[in-house]
Amino acid sequence: MADPRVPSSYNVTPRIRYNTVGGVNGPLVILDNVKFPRYNEIVTLTLPDGTQRSGQVLEARGNRAVVQVFEGTSGIDVKKTKVEFTGESLKLGVSEDMLGRIFDGSGRAIDKGPKVLAEEYLDINGSPINPYAREYPQEMISTGISAIDTMNSIARGQKIPIFSAAGLPHNEIAAQICRQAGLVQRQGITNKGVHDGHEENFSIVFGAMGVNLETARFFTRDFEENGSLGRTTLFLNLANDPTIERIITPRLALTTAEYYAYQLEKHVLVILTDLSSYCDALREVSAAREEVPGRRGFPGYMYTDLSTIYERAGRVAGRNGSITQIPILTMPNDDITHPIPDLTGYITEGQIFVDRGLHNRGIYPPINVLPSLSRLMKSAIGEGMTRKDHGDVSNQLYAKYAIGRDAAAMKAVVGEEALSNEDKLSLEFLDKFERSFIAQGPYESRTIFESLDLAWSLLRIYRKDMLNRIPKKIIDEFYSRSAADRKGKGKDKPTTKDTRDTAAPEEENLIDA
């Protein structure tokens, strides 16, 4: 049976069949006496029982080739296994029909649906984008999460990772983003084409690497139950799947996203989890090739390899579509200096930090905004995009939250009696900020306008003269707004209400305070 990932036109080309497997080492097969092997060329291996596996040439040196086998090397007989070189790199058949479908880590459909009729076959390694053709990421993608939208806004075309750790709810956050993510239509826009700003033109590509069966079921069930599966394409590589398959899973997801963005002109959000599993697979292949290890055993080229994934986000001139990446990685031992988050931070444009301390206090989502950063936030917010007070409110929230954390640390040393009235006010803001602004229900979606109004209700704890990060004209316009005025702002915006009904009285109390 021919490999479904390789076009049928390649299968009729006469090929040389080799029976020269020299050895097997982990996920690698060493071939001897082969003619003109090429780097990244796809290889078909036929086992004695007739089953076929596919692999990719990792190293070609003279008449010797090293091949990584995607389905694993167990059961390969060195003397009886036959090998064919296809002459092509790995390609993925893409189509708009892939929306709403679930694939495994090798690109094969696993949802019992009909076969996808490919409209194009694209190289999974992508094509280099001319830097001059790249457009600066602008306009905001809404996640419905206040801590992200208000203080770490994500621009269309940005790449921003989520730094998490074992035992933290990064899977729940990823599922919530997939449920709630959408476009914030830029006000007054007339020259971006009919596609821009339309909700039906927003799609999600979700790639999971090395997840267990329970996590895979959680994502598929969640997407099916809330109705977001219709705009989502899933690639699932499970923990019991071959490790080497994790090398190609994110590339399959990004190839699909590039087709949606640049051919169908959709705005695509790509969520990849868990990049730590991907890097572990990279280390395993490097060890099998007996390469000189780098920091903590990871290969020295891991920075370059990660960049081939992250740099496929962005926008291209002449196309209305965009690719926004949110890769998720788990930091071993909560260590942000580990090579994986360290190198990721050099390539990407910020990070969203999931904090264990907030999680232990029962706050969901436990996003610590102080170490979090969005380097392209300034191009995604402001008048005409979100609201003119957005940037100033964000700066003031950062300042007051940092002061509140300092006051909490001082209270632990000297006690509450030694604190000044201003310190006690900062402690009050700290508690309400974490309990009512950062915290929200897993099925609660807040528009950016609702999040900004909630932020103002918190800032009213302070007198006007204490808000030193906001210009006076902004304070005069937004500080004294009544609750009725604020509630009328986001009526035309769709929201998913769950815990917001219980949060409304608390918001009124904050205004009174």
UniProtKB/Swiss-Prot annotation:
Keyword Ion transport: yes
Record's subcellular location: Vacuole membrane
Membrane topology of the entry: Peripheral membrane protein
Annotated Basic and acidic residues bias: 484-503
Sequence segments annotated as region (Disordered): 484-513
Keywords of this entry: ATP-binding, Hydrogen ion transport, Ion transport, Membrane, Nucleotide-binding, Transport, Vacuole
Domain of life: Eukaryota
Molecular functions (GO terms): ATP binding; proton-transporting ATPase activity, rotational mechanism
GO terms of biological process kind: ATP metabolic process; vacuolar acidification
Any Pfam family matching the protein: ATP-synt_ab_N
Binding site for ATP: 375
Designated name of the protein: V-type proton ATPase subunit B
Organism: Neurospora crassa (strain ATCC 24698 / 74-OR23-1A / CBS 708.71 / DSM 1257 / FGSC 987)
Gene assigned in the entry: vma-2
